[in-house]
Amino acid sequence: EDTINLIKTFYLRFPQYRWFTFRDLRGLSQEEFANAISECFVSVWIDRQSAYGTFPLESMKVGVPVIGITPNLVPEWMNENNGIWIKDEILLSDIIADWTQNWLEDNISEEMYTNMKETVDKLPTKEQFENKTIELFTEYLELRAQSMEEQISKFND
């Protein structure tokens, strides 16, 4: 519903931009999603509940800048140099319109693109994340098993 309200507000306030569309990328396969997002000139993120924010990171990874609402729990990767992050949802349509005008005039700072790339390059890949998660859980389970064996040994003595 937030998305629909944003789109309606945007088109009502800025009818000159009715020629471009907002795309809902939910429900797409991973490949379709990656292709669709790479065709955008900006991504809009309005999820206040998401604590990590994979959507903005995926956008940054393919070189698409993000305008977003700062979530309740701000991810550690989020900073003022790698996207346009705002707290006041009411300003979102104005900021999208300003961004669009700057984009049309080829007036977007290359520094933002550089900062986006640096942000995603610092983060682990999906495979690295999965391997680290497996490693941590394996270590945890081994420690738990060792602790249980020690307790059983004490009980049997």
PLM regions: where:
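Acidic donor-binding loop of glycosyltransferase active sites
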Residues: 35-51
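Short hydrophobic beta-strand element within catalytic cores of glycosyltransferases
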Residues: 65-68
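Short alpha-helical segment that forms part of, or immediately flanks, the ligand-binding pocket
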Residues: 34, 57-61, 75-76
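A charged, aromatic-enriched C-terminal amphipathic alpha-helix characteristic of glycosyltransferases
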Residues: 104-156
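Nucleotide-sugar-dependent
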Residues: 47-55, 71, 75-76
